[in-house]
């Protein structure tokens, strides 16, 4: 499933085409994805100007003038692609063959920019776990977004805040970090990478780094910094291309080439002087990768 860096990469890819453009045609080619499309879906968007394209956690938000806010989730395999009048490959940009059948093109947005340039934005989702819903008013009050926790970007998430979120929690540290009500947008890949950078075991009790001790304060600060840096690095690399994820132009993200532990079972730990090896364990049905030698 695309995580926050992948969704942010998609947002940045769509933004130049969608923001300020007018929706001249909106076509939903089936009645539902994971959920049914909102009533009068096409009618309520057609003719509207897109004022902003935002992101909250793993959700995209499309704001239109005098209309509802469209909330979109990519699900397991959802992706957008952009088609223009000039669809030649951009020099210097890596492209790969699309493996997805156009039979899974479920939503089409035709837009015209202020300068008259026309584009088509297509949502493709083979597994149909993605969805599009309307928020009337602020999207922050929509049930899908209302309970989300702090964003792991910028400097909001620091050691003090992280310790307050984890205080008293007896669940494994990795499980607590995946709780979207605490920190919004973190997923399996980047939690594993952040815990390795911070030198903390995913198996340890979450509340142990929130104790009133110097060591715990250092651990919470180290983990907060690791979370922020992993997310920032992944966004800069365009996300991680695993299985279904691709950019809006069909190119791949590259952060997977920087993985220290994720999907590297049996390999030597890359931390200098460690000497350990990456192990895989299953937590709550998900694979966890870590080094027991340098993560405690």
UniProtKB/Swiss-Prot annotation:
It catalyses: Hydrolysis of DNA containing ring-opened 7-methylguanine residues, releasing 2,6-diamino-4-hydroxy-5-(N-methyl)formamidopyrimidine; 2'-deoxyribonucleotide-(2'-deoxyribose 5'-phosphate)-2'-deoxyribonucleotide-DNA = a 3'-end 2'-deoxyribonucleotide-(2,3-dehydro-2,3-deoxyribose 5'-phosphate)-DNA + a 5'-end 5'-phospho-2'-deoxyribonucleoside-DNA + H(+). Coiled coil: none annotated. GO terms for molecular function: 8-oxo-7,8-dihydroguanine DNA N-glycosylase activity; class I DNA-(apurinic or apyrimidinic site) endonuclease activity; damaged DNA binding; zinc ion binding. This is Formamidopyrimidine-DNA glycosylase. Gene3D superfamilies: 1.10.8.50, MutM-like, N-terminal. One of its GO terms (biological process) is base-excision repair. The active site is at residues 2-3, 58, 286. Its EC number is 3.2.2.23, 4.2.99.18. Its cofactor is Zn(2+). InterPro entries: DNA_glyclase/AP_lyase_DNA-bd (IPR015886), DNA_glyclase_Znf_dom_DNA_BS (IPR015887), Formamido-pyr_DNA_Glyclase (IPR020629), FPG_cat (IPR012319), MutM-like_N-ter (IPR035937), Ribosomal_uS13-like_H2TH (IPR010979), Znf_DNA_glyclase/AP_lyase (IPR000214), Znf_FPG/IleRS (IPR010663). Belongs to the FPG family. Binds 1 zinc ion per subunit. NCBIfam families: fpg (TIGR00577), PRK01103.1 (NF002211). Involved in base excision repair of DNA damaged by oxidation or by mutagenic agents. Acts as a DNA glycosylase that recognizes and removes damaged bases. Has a preference for oxidized purines, such as 7,8-dihydro-8-oxoguanine (8-oxoG). Has AP (apurinic/apyrimidinic) lyase activity and introduces nicks in the DNA strand. Cleaves the DNA backbone by beta-delta elimination to generate a single-strand break at the site of the removed base with both 3'- and 5'-phosphates. Keywords: DNA damage, DNA repair, DNA-binding, Glycosidase, Hydrolase, Lyase, Metal-binding, Multifunctional enzyme, Zinc, Zinc-finger. The gene is mutM. A zinc finger (FPG-type) spans 260-296. It comes from Mesorhizobium japonicum (strain LMG 29417 / CECT 9101 / MAFF 303099) (Mesorhizobium loti (strain MAFF 303099)). It holds the Pfam family zf-FPG_IleRS. DNA binds at residues 104, 127, 169. Monomer.
């Amino acid at each position: 499933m695309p995580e926050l860096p992948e969704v942010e990469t998609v947002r940045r890819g769509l933004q130049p085409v969608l923001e300020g453009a007018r929706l001249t045609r909106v076509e939903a080619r089936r009645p539902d994805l994971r959920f049914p499309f909102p009533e009068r879906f096409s009618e309520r968007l057609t003719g509207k100007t897109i004022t902003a394209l935002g992101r909250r956690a793993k959700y995209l938000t499309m704001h239109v003038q005098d209309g509802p806010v469209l909330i979109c989730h990519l699900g397991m395999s959802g992706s957008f692609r952009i088609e223009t009048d000039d669809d030649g490959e951009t020099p210097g940009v890596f492209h790969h063959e699309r493996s997805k059948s156009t039979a899974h093109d479920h939503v089409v947005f035709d837009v015209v920019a202020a300068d008259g340039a026309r584009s088509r934005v297509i949502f493709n989702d083979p597994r149909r776990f993605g969805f599009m819903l309307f928020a009337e008013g602020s999207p922050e009050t929509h049930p899908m977004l209302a309970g989300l926790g702090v964003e792991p970007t910028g400097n909001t998430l620091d050691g003090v805040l992280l310790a307050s979120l984890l205080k008293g929690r007896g669940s494994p540290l990795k499980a607590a970090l995946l709780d979207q009500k605490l920190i919004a947008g973190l997923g399996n890949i980047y939690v594993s990478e952040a815990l390795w950078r911070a030198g903390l075991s995913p198996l340890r009790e979450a509340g142990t780094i929130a104790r009133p001790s110097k060591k715990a304060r250092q651990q919470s600060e180290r983990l907060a910094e690791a979370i922020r840096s992993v997310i920032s690095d992944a966004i800069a690399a365009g996300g991680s291309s695993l299985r279904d994820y691709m950019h809006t132009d069909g190119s791949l993200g590259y952060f997977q080439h920087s993985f220290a532990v994720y999907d590297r079972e049996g390999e030597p730990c890359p931390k200098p002087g460690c000497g350990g090896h990456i192990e895989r364990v299953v937590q709550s049905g998900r694979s966890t990768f870590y080094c027991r030698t340098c993560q405690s």
